[in-house]
Every structure is written in C-alpha cells, then in structure tokens.
C-alpha cells in the first residue's frame, strides 16, 4: 500500500485532474483507491461527483481538527473501488486553529497510519490532492507520503517553479520525512502545435531524466468539461485524447511497480 501526494505549488497545472483520473484508471484495474482531498477548494470532491458543501465535521477537516477519525469520514463514490475523504472551504482555517500545536505537521500521518494499520488491505493506493501552495496542509501531506507525483504544465516558467518545489521537498526530507521520494513528473497541457511545449519537454527530460514519464497529457477540452459533470474524463468520454493519455499513463504508473517496488 502506497501513499502518494500529487503536488505542485503552482495552480492550474492539472493536479486535481491527474488525481481523479489516475484514481479512476487504477480502480478500473481492480485496485482499491482512497482519494484524500486536502485542497479547501474541494475540486477533487466535486470532480468525483460529491458535494463540497457537506458538514465540515464529515470531511478531512473533521479528522484534522480532532472531531472525527478517518474511518468515520470515508465516502463511497459512484465508481467501483474508489473512495474519497471530501473537503470544503472550512479547511482553509486549519492553519490558524492549530497554531499552538507543535506537532501539527504530523496530525494527518498519525490519523492515517492508525486507520491503515487497523484495516490492512483496505486500499492499494492513497492519493492525496494537495493545495497549490506550500501551506500547512501541503506539509501534512508530504510528511505522511511515501512518494510524490508532480504534474508539470508545459508552459513558460514551469521549470523554474519545479526547481523551487524540489528545494521545498529536500527541506521536508531533511527535517520531517527522510524517506520521501519523487515517484515521477507528468507533463500536462501539452500542445504539439506549440514549440514551447516541446521545448519544455526537452528541458524537463534533459534535467530530470528518467523521473519524467513517457506519457504526456495533451490539452483537451473534455478534460475541462468532465469535472463539471462530476466524473473523471476516463468515464465521461473514454475515446477523447485526454482519456487515452490518462489510460496510457495509468499503465505506465502501474508498470513502475516492477522497478521501484514498495520503496516508491
């Protein structure tokens, strides 16, 4: 069982889209998946067909403020093998509310570890959708994760932002989670008609080498439409270019297991 945070400090890079479609792809391969929506915007929540207007106690906020345990807030989605812990805007207040707790960075790890130890075999993967900033919530996710998946938009300044993110990850490894690894970098919003996309791809592959997945996710209007219908694009339109790319990426992600094993 692996806990993987999907992270980028920049918004609008396809982070949540990657979470919900990787989760859907893995679930269709009979993998049991738990998505944790750790973004106060709640986009992973609505993108999987649930409401981000639920009572705050019944969301990840309830777990992190101590009013609920993990097992009490897990919700079934409409998709087989795919569960979620939802989020809503109240989560944005957690950093202020826990200001006096010196161990607050470890709250999620403590709660999640306790649950998974009691229910071994419940899930093959836990995927955490991080907020697009280096906030307390992001630190919580990094502390409890085995590895990180980084969506990288193939646009100007993308690599500069990625370099900053890598520095942040190194600081977390030194102080809070020495076993944290980069599982891979996924190129998103790729436009083959645009020279900039191919340039960013080349620079990313030259610098990060095997960490960059072979699969690239194209710009595709269906990827933008699907969340408004409360479903992953893999289900909303299986034949569109975005779906085909995420199916391919899911296969590549699974095939990593033979090379990285449980240490990922």
Protein language model regions, located:
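P-loop NTP-binding core
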Residues: 1-264
């Amino acid at each position: 069982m692996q806990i993987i945070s999907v992270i980028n400090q920049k918004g609008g890079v396809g982070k949540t889209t990657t979470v919900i479609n990787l989760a859907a792809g893995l679930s269709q391969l009979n993998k049991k998946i738990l998505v944790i929506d750790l973004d106060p915007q709640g986009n992973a929540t609505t993108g999987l067909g649930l409401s981000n207007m639920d009572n705050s106690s019944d969301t990840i906020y309830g777990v992190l403020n101590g009013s609920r345990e993990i097992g009490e807030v897990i919700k079934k989605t409409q998709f087989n093998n795919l569960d979620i812990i939802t989020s809503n805007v109240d989560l944005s207040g957690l950093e202020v509310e826990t200001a006096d707790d010196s161990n607050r960075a470890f709250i999620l790890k403590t709660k999640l570890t306790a649950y998974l130890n009691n229910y071994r075999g419940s899930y093959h993967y836990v995927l955490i959708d991080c907020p697009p900033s280096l906030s307390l919530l992001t630190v919580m996710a990094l502390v409890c994760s085995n590895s990180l998946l980084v969506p990288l938009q193939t646009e100007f300044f993308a690599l500069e932002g990625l370099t900053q993110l890598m520095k942040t990850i190194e600081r977390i490894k030194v102080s809070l989670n020495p076993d944290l690894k980069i599982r891979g970098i996924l190129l998103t919003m790729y436009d083959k008609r645009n020279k900039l996309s191919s340039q960013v791809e080349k620079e990313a592959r030259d610098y990060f080498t095997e960490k960059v997945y072979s699969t690239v996710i194209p710009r595709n209007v269906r990827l933008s439409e699907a969340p408004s219908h409360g479903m992953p694009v893999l289900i909303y339109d299986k034949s569109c270019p975005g779906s085909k790319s995420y199916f391919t990426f899911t296969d590549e992600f699974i095939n990593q297991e033979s090379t990285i094993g449980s240490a990922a």
